[in-house]
Amino acid sequence: MTQGDRQIDLAILGAGCAGLSLAARLAAANSSLRVVLVEPRDGYTEDRTWCGWRLQPHFFEDCNVAEWNHWQLSKDGQTLKRSSQSYPYEMLSASKVYDKALRTISGSRSITLMLGVQATKHREDEGEVEIELDNGKRLKARWVVDTRPRLAAIKHPWLWQSFVGIVAQLRGPEADFERSLPLLMDFQSDAPGLIDFMYILPVGDRSYLFEYTRFSAHRAAAFELESRLQSWLARHAAQAGNSWQELRRESGDLPMAKVEPPGSRRIVLAGARGGSMRIATGYAFHNIQRWADECATTLLQDGKPIGPRKNGFLDWMDELFLRVLQRPDVLPEHVMWSLFAESEPDALVRFLSGQPRIGDYWPVVRGLPWSKFVATAAVNLSPLKSAP
């Protein structure tokens, strides 16, 4: 272990999903690389839920608490059901992911996790990066992987995905929404956001994740989303005679925006900040796992980290999609509904997960309002003209 003013091989700034995933891979491979993770939080709790379609096996597969081969959308009393036998939609427990990563890392003599510490500034020289910490210490690292959340403001056409959710156990008679399948989007047509929807996952024993989500140009106020979540529960659960016990809660704001340029020659951006999050959906966990595998392999072979894979065409399509959603002559929830209703499910899953095959594009876009997309593309066709 080397810290203070002594040189290390790799500093990982931010020990959330991406930072822990990379460090756990290195520890599992018995890497001798000297690694320090710098994380502001003092400890880990069940603070979030990671979900998405599992396209390949991954390191944390045994941390899922539920998975489904079928899912649903709901709009104006209609229900749309879709399925994939190839790609299950899985829900992962944050505490299980954290515990597995921390156990794996603790078995390494060359990896140190510094909790309750922040990196305040850095200076890059020819052969190293010097990092100042808020505890007065310094790290000198050959390479840096920066996974900390982006701080920059976002501009049109980019959006915020804001959400407030609870995991609750119902008590009483069966309510109208109680199903064994995940409800990915229950559109709330009377809400002020560009798109508002309920996201509901059944986790067993009449326990559910209830999440109120909004896509909008500005961060939504948490108290407003909380109010709408409670109103929804009152309409659909309380009126059916149910009470519920809140087990935990989660909230967040995801920037649905183009990623920043690479940090520098010796600083690699990773996680959502580096491009692992799909702009148009917010899904990130499984892409982070793919990156962690690839980055760990490169570090073990060459001693040098790499960032997430970039797909400029997908980024362009995401920008075009978000621009169309914000047209005054478009009903965004109708576009989202058509996307799921008209697309071949496996192709759509690969597309939404950021891993489309060449033959997936047409099965995905054929059901969308072509005239709106063509008109929007004609004005904004230069690849990704807008500012990050």
Name the predicted role of every residue range:
Residues 91-114, 236:
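Helical element adjacent to the flavin cofactor pocket in flavoenzyme catalytic cores
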Residues 57-85, 104-107, 121-126, 193:
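Flavin (FAD/FMN) cofactor-binding and adjacent substrate-gating region
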Residues 2-36:
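N-terminal Rossmann-like FAD-binding beta1-loop-alpha1 element of flavoenzymes
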Residues 15, 148-149, 271:
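Glycine-rich, N-terminal phosphate-binding loop of Rossmann-like dinucleotide-binding domains
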Residues 25-78:
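N-terminal FAD cofactor-binding segment of flavoenzymes
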Residues 293-388:
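C-terminal helical "tail/cap" subdomain of flavin- and related membrane-associated enzymes
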Residues 25, 108-240, 244:
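Predominantly flavin-linked oxidoreductase catalytic cores and closely associated redox partners
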Residues 118, 190-192, 213-295:
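FAD/FMN-dependent oxidoreductases across multiple families
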